[in-house]
Amino acid sequence: MATIVSGFLVPHDPIMFVAPDAPAKDIADKAWGAYETCAVHLADLDVDTVIIIGNDHYMLFGTTCLPQYCIATGDLDGPLDQMPGLKRQLIPNDEALATHIATHGHADGFDWAVARSFTTDHSFSIPFQKIVQRASEIKGKEIKAIPVYLASAVDPFLSMQRSQQLGQAIAKAVKAFKGDERIAVIGSGGISHWVGTKESGTVNEDFDREILAYCLSLDEASIMALSDERILSEGGNGAMELRNFVCAMAAVEADSSELIEYQPVPEWVTGLGFVELKKNPTKS
């Protein structure tokens, strides 16, 4: 069977690429360095495939189709919203595992939307290029990736409970896969940030540290207990992406965790948190 061996919770902040020199150099260096640390740790894990759980930003899915959750099972490229330092490119997909996750889910009460050809946005491509692709370079082998997109940025939002259940379904499907792949899962999202509102540029460090404390104690329940009203008020509309974190945490079933970095960066409009979700090797 395939095995999920680790996971990461990371941001996908496009302003880092558009305005890389906006914050003080030491702050910027810590944020970019956190991606490199994640890449080094991922390379050390010797994984074959990474499942990246992100969300659309009204770029890939429009008013005609807003899936609650979608998995890409075929040809991949991206990001659609390419920017300096994040160029559009072909992406190696683990088509067999992605198809299995969708098929297994359909038989188990999870009605996946399936994309047999897919172009990603920055929520996938930032962690892919900065962590997965970089780990491939360090390791000297190709690491494949599977995009999973949740409705966590555009309403109607996927519920927190269903986000957790979907992560559990991913874990169950991976365990049932007839292969010996080593898998990692990345939950891609910001903590506090306001997108397209007058509050844009505000970072609520207290809220961020509360969320990171829940992540570090592997406390999905406390994140799930946050009402959408509180998230929107204290974390902004961008913090609805916490659903991505919950889904990833449920999929990884970690034994411990480590804070790699946290920086509140108003110049990049968000709180940047990086957490590694670790599994006991004897259990993986």
Q: Which residues fall in each region the model found?
A:
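Catalytic metal-binding/acid-base residues of hydrolase active sites
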Residues: 56-58, 191-192
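Beta-strand elements within well-structured catalytic alpha/beta cores of enzymes
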Residues: 48-54, 148, 181-189
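Non-transmembrane, aqueous-exposed alpha-helical and coiled segments at domain scale
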Residues: 155, 168-183
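Divalent-metal (often Zn2+) His-rich catalytic cores of metallo-beta-lactamase-fold enzymes
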Residues: 189, 194-199
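Flexible, D/E/H-enriched segments
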Residues: 1-48, 63-165, 176, 198-284
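Glycine-rich His-Gly loop
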Residues: 12-13, 55-57
